[in-house]
Amino acid sequence: MSTYTPPYQLTDAILRLSTEIAATVKEITVRGNLSAQPQLHRTNRIRSVHSSLAIEHNSLTLDQVTALLNGKRVLAPQQEVWEVQNAFRAYDLLPSLDPYSIDDLLKVHRAMMDGLVMGAGTFRNTGVGVYAGDQLIHAGTPAQYVPEAMQQLFVWLQNTTAHPLVASCVFHYEFEFIHPFADGNGRTGRLWQTLILRKWEPIFTYLPIESMILEHQADYYAALNAANTQGSATVFIEFMLEMILEALKNVYVKQHIKSPEDQLLVLLKSDPRMTIPVMAEHLGLSDRQIRRLIASLKAQNRLRREGSNKTGRWVVSRKSR
């Protein structure tokens, strides 16, 4: 089997972002033991699953995903419920997975897509394409070459001297380029990047990078398409490093915000339609405690509600920003 080296260049932006990410990881680790914060783990895992599936057009809200994790019934299309339940099972496998094992990759895909597609946990044996409407924008590697292409990619990953930050982004791009499965490539590729990163720094186990990708979804696909056009992963590496840094900065900010009121305002600035149960889930408080915080913030003119209870949104006043 020939040796394969994915094409990319180390740009000033990649070096700068990698340095800043490493420094931010160190700062977060020094200031707080995230491994000892199970509530944060739970909240971020919910955000990861919700965001990764929302990118794939799953319509369940953050509230509904939270309810499913809590064992509650949700009124939603059954397939979308299965997608969420499967994704939680797949992410729960992270601590036991080897990022250099193709067998483990197949295990993750099986968990992620069980009951959703034929052949879950096996490489595809037919052609596959990525479409924008009716327009084909990317054709995956021909099916007969997929096993060899994946083997070469895993050999490169295990032997590369590239920094894990860069290697994880390269793998993510190459995985999506090959598109080894009939379905579920996006959600599986994003999980595998998390797996590669957590081997470098455990903090990434519960870092919801997927939430940043969802917020910048158009840019995510634009970076993939630009890399395809340029025949190099460089632009995609730069994009993903920006998303990783943004996700880390969110954690860093929360570490420095001690007041529950200010923590709530940060949440509502990021998601103005967040419901009280989800606020409570994020902050580890009861619904009653959240209502008291909201009442206090309203009295201080730091928060107001626009629209109805069902369809409205929260507006954080400018003096609170």
How would you describe each model-predicted region?
Residues 1-321:
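FIC/Doc superfamily catalytic core
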